[in-house]
Amino acid sequence: GPAPFVRAPCPEPAVPAASPPIDRKGLSAAIASYVLWGVFPLYWYLLKHVPSLQIISHRIVWCALFVVGFLVLREGWGWLRAALSRPRVGWMLLASSLLISFNWGVYIWAVTNGRVVEASLGYFINPLVNVLIGVLVLHERLNRAQWIAVAIAALGLLWLALLHGDPPWISLALALSFAIYGLIRKLANVDAVPGLAIESLILLLPALAWLGVAQAQGVGAFGSGDWRSDALLVFGGALTALPLIGFAYGARRIPYSLVGILQYIAPTLQLISGVWLLGEDFTGTQAVGFGAIWVALAIYG
């Protein structure tokens, strides 16, 4: 057949390529997800009369029902078959499910015990912990500015530990557990929402068993006559899944560098919630420590 028509190169002066327009829906989904994560403390605070382990167990049970239902309606059971066909992935998701349940436990305990400010610090330092894991585990290389950023953040944490009387263990526990969780999920190479569904299914039996014991002992919070608490416990599962579904949608459609900036929406809103809405202290000492970490993030970013 005839040769395909090829347009001759145009001799017009070169114009620098414009960056592609940002996907509005993707951006909106990502921002909405981070805002939801940011106001989580206010939600869990409403359940502070319920023991933390019961809150986590309900969160797992209702999250499993919501996410599995969402996936089955959307695409059937293929996601589960795909994961089960790779045993290594199953073991990795077992490890990640234990880490995320620990992370949720520390976070809910912090919120219901007046430590939201400390919890927010955990998510400010999380990106820098990710950097260190990248260096130590994935053998990524840092430039001088990035090393300076990590050093300043470490000094900020040391300042908080020495002058605040005790190490910011809630912040460190949240940052480390979430960073290692992120690493395992990266290596497992499973999409965010199917991964959360499988993690929830792994944790489902222990969660149901714990709730069963609580009900049998007469200390179960669910169904004890307070319909508001019951509704909050049920919707906590959907609220766990919704931002992750939104984030999974958004992160695929916007530049990853933009995700890196947007991730600070959540801890900023958590800090504001803790100080202005829940009345927690934010001392000058803490301001200096947080300030060092914000400087580090600005240098790294």
What are these regions (language model features)?
Residues 3-32, 65-93, 144, 196, ...:
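Membrane-interface interhelical linkers
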Residues 9-54, 155-187, 209, 273:
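Glycine-/small-residue-enriched transmembrane alpha-helix faces in small-molecule transporters
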Residues 16, 264-301:
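C-terminal-most transmembrane helix of multi-pass membrane proteins
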Residues 35-39, 43, 94-111, 173-184, ...:
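Hydrophobic alpha-helical transmembrane segments of multi-pass membrane transport proteins
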Residues 36-63, 117-118, 180-205, 220:
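Juxtamembrane helix-loop-helix junctions in multi-pass membrane proteins
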Residues 49-54, 105-122, 245-262, 281:
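Structural motif at transmembrane-helix junctions in multi-pass transporters
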Residues 67, 145-161, 172-176, 285-301:
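Hydrophobic transmembrane alpha-helices of multi-pass small-molecule transport proteins
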Residues 121-125, 192-202, 241-276:
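Helix-helix packing/entry segments at the starts of transmembrane helices
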